[in-house]
């Protein structure tokens, strides 16, 4: 047993404790201790266990083990959440029947004399939106599953913009995090792009912004193994930008039989040190494909798959500033 608590003891008014035995958790594993603290706290504020049933309503797991593998694998806090990376409050069945569902968030915030904390950042896109500086480090929290946090950024000239959004966690690969982050980029009220990588809970952005005012909106999202119901919690935003010695990188492409022919043009004030074609199969997550010397301006490639291939060019100047081209999509013919 990793911990002990009484269901509903938070409201008894007599300081009844909940116990977590760290020497039995790992021993002393930060992930296991964090999960057990959350689990026993859940009992104290009125929650029962979360269970799993088959299609015929037969109980298969008294403690729901969750599902998935890797960084976005998921389990409910009130199940057995030790062995999945992402964990969260849940709205699902208890051991008392497949139709006996337990809305964790409603129970926690309506039966214990407290509710959600005050929102830290507004989601409105206007002059009052919190403004980012040219270099920033900000702590925020997605409080409810309808909460969004908006940040305004104004570029006075074309800039290379980098931002990392990291959910609060207790180890590598965001282990123990409760928040899977999605970021949306707006130009005024127009949604330009959504950053929601399928295989990771954090978001890393490298992009070029033309002069203008933009809004970055942070949201909790679901993934292949869970919904956005319990995708809540703290996060940190860090970022920086700077003027571009590389003014433009333009990538073009065509299909010749089954080969993809790529060509590009670079306009820059500084010499180019490295060039690298990157490939993606979803247009979001890119990986290196081939590197070239600074004078190369063309590349021919026979793709490994016959589906859609997305390409972009990553260019690094001699003063270590990075710029990316536009993204092009090509599909093998024939």
What are these regions (language model features)?
Residues 1-55, 75:
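Active-site-proximal segment of zinc-dependent metalloprotease catalytic domains
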Residues 66-100:
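Post-HExxH zinc-binding segment in Zn-dependent metallohydrolases
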Residues 96-132, 149-151, 175-190, 206-244:
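C-terminal edge strands of extracellular/lumenal beta-sandwich accessory domains
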Residues 132-160, 202-204, 215:
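Non-catalytic, beta-strand-enriched accessory regions in extracellular/secretory proteins
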Residues 147, 197-204, 292-299:
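Short, solvent-exposed loop/turn segments in extracellular or other extracytoplasmic domains
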Residues 159-175, 224-225, 266:
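Short amphipathic, basic-aromatic surface patches that mediate peripheral association
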Residues 166, 219-221, 314-318:
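Beta-strand-rich extracellular modules
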Residues 241-334:
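Short, compositionally biased serine/threonine- and acidic-rich segments at solvent-exposed termini, linkers
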């Amino acid at each position: 047993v990793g911990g002990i608590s009484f269901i509903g003891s938070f409201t008894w008014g007599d300081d009844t404790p909940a116990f977590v035995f760290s020497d039995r958790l790992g021993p002393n594993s930060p992930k296991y201790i964090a999960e057990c603290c959350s689990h026993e706290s859940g009992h104290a504020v009125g929650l029962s266990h979360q269970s799993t049933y088959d299609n015929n309503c037969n109980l298969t797991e008294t403690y729901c083990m969750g599902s998935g593998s890797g960084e976005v694998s998921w389990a409910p806090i009130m199940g057995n959440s030790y062995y999945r990376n992402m964990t969260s409050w849940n709205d699902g069945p208890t051991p008392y029947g497949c139709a006996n569902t337990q809305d964790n968030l409603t129970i926690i915030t309506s039966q214990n004399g407290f509710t959600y904390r005050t929102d830290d950042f507004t989601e409105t896109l206007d002059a009052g939106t919190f403004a980012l500086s040219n270099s920033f480090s900000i702590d925020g929290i997605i409080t409810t599953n309808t909460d969004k946090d908006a940040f305004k950024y104004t570029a006075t000239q074309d800039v290379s913009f980098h931002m990392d959004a990291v959910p609060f966690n207790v180890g590598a690969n965001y282990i123990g995090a409760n928040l899977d982050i999605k970021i949306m980029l707006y130009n005024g009220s127009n949604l330009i792009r959504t950053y929601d990588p399928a295989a990771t809970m954090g978001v890393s952005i490298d992009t070029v912004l033309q002069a203008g005012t933009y809004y970055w909106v942070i949201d909790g999202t679901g993934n292949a193994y869970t919904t956005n119901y319990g995708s809540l919690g703290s996060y940190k935003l860090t970022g920086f930008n700077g003027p571009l010695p590389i003014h433009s990188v333009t990538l073009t492409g065509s299909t010749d039989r089954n080969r993809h022919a790529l060509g590009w043009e670079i306009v820059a004030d500084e010499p180019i040190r490295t060039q690298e074609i990157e490939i993606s199969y979803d247009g979001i997550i890119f990986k290196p494909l081939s590197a070239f010397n600074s004078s190369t301006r063309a590349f021919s490639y026979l793709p490994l798959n016959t589906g859609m291939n997305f390409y972009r060019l990553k260019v690094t100047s001699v003063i270590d500033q990075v710029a990316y081209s536009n993204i092009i999509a090509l599909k093998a013919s024939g």
